[in-house]
Amino acid sequence: MKDVPGFLQQSQSAGPGQAAVWHRLEELYNKKLWHQLTLQVLDFVQDPCFAQGDGLIKLYENFISEFEHRVNPLSLVEIILHVVRQMTDPTVALTFLEKTREKVKSSDEAVILCKTAIGALKLNIGDLQVTKETIEEVEEMLNNLPGVTSVHSRFYDLSSKYYQTIGNHASYYKDALRFLGCIDVKDLPVSEQQERAFTLGLAGLLGEGVYNFGELLMHPVLESLRSTDRQWLIDTLYAFNSGNVETFQALKSAWGQQPDLAANEALLLQKIQLLCLMEMTFTRPANHRQLTFEEIAKSAKVTVNEVELLVMKALSVGLVKGSIDEVDKRVHMTWVQPRVLDLQQIKGMKDRLEFWCTDVRSMEMLVEHQAHDILT
């Protein structure tokens, strides 16, 4: 049995400036107000004044461990994550988290958060295989939770960092966006916003199978790069989203300075040419999606002889559906893959909808005026 009153009294004497906080903890503990005590401890462990040295480890050993069985499991893990940060030996931290996981197994969210913390530690020490296995286990558990919870953001932060470490651009792009979707970006320091926006932008450009940039372009995190020396990345992303090959080539003096982009120039060119074909299809009226080889060649900056190969590539990866008329050198498109649109593309849709409404009104007037002739 630990001497909790003695520890609290000693702590009050050791730090006169924080005596009121320690006194409050003692008061709530003595009154057995476990919920209020939990909230007070959560505030306590996040206070930089107390999060120094091994103070939180001592707090856990001499105080929290005495009533942890009365604490909400998820709140307990939240508290313990702060304690673990003061453990310099990863092995000790991992053992501590494993024991905690057993204590909170009644709550799926608490177990998920605990496993995510274990995965983060494994990633930090370079154990990629165990990190991968942990991510797969946790993802399966997350899929069974209703809606988005407080543990989702921590999981997506871990999974995106893992994919970044192994160089899987497409998976990083997907999960890093999910992470941002679970938090308020204003809570991140500007420097972190800029770093996340930059790595996300690069991953989107380089990611295999990533043809949807609308969600990133509409996210406020990207604004952190505006009016900085990385503004060129925003311009490049907008060029890709609209399939503007000419703008992409004009920006080469900027993106060409980035080693990863420069090394993958051929891949980037093919991707933006495919996006150009998608945009050409999307902006055409549904009843007029006949594209000539010459039109495609001009917009995508390819030769007429290369058009058929470009269209076949777009068809094979499921970006568009349609058929190629080799004799007339035309492509008839019937479908284009849905994407998140930027504001300019939404405006284009609005204009086309207004044009369609005008057509409908004209037909209505025609029928109204000539109904007698038609019926007789």
Curated annotation (Swiss-Prot):
Domain of life: Eukaryota
InterPro entries: PCI_dom, PSD13_N, PSMD13, WH_DNA-bd_sf
Pfam families (UniProt xref): PCI (PF01399), PSD13_N (PF22037)
Ranges for domain PCI: 171-338
PROSITE patterns recorded: PCI
UniProt entry tagged with the keyword Cell inner membrane: no
Residues that span the membrane, as ranges: none
Leader peptide range in chain numbering: none
GO cellular component terms, A-Z: cytosol; nucleus; proteasome accessory complex; proteasome regulatory particle, lid subcomplex
GO molecular function: structural molecule activity
Keywords: Proteasome
SUPFAM superfamilies documented for this protein: Winged helix' DNA-binding domain
Presence of the UniProt keyword Kinase in the record: no
Gene Ontology annotations of biological process type: ubiquitin-dependent protein catabolic process
Family recorded in the similarity comment: Belongs to the proteasome subunit S11 family.
Record function comment: Component of the 26S proteasome, a multiprotein complex involved in the ATP-dependent degradation of ubiquitinated proteins. This complex plays a key role in the maintenance of protein homeostasis by removing misfolded or damaged proteins, which could impair cellular functions, and by removing proteins whose functions are no longer required. Therefore, the proteasome participates in numerous cellular processes, including cell cycle progression, apoptosis, or DNA damage repair.
Oligomer and partners: Component of the 19S proteasome regulatory particle complex. The 26S proteasome consists of a 20S core particle (CP) and two 19S regulatory subunits (RP). The regulatory particle is made of a lid composed of 9 subunits including PSMD13, a base containing 6 ATPases and few additional components.
Stated name of the protein: 26S proteasome non-ATPase regulatory subunit 13
Species, as recorded: Gallus gallus
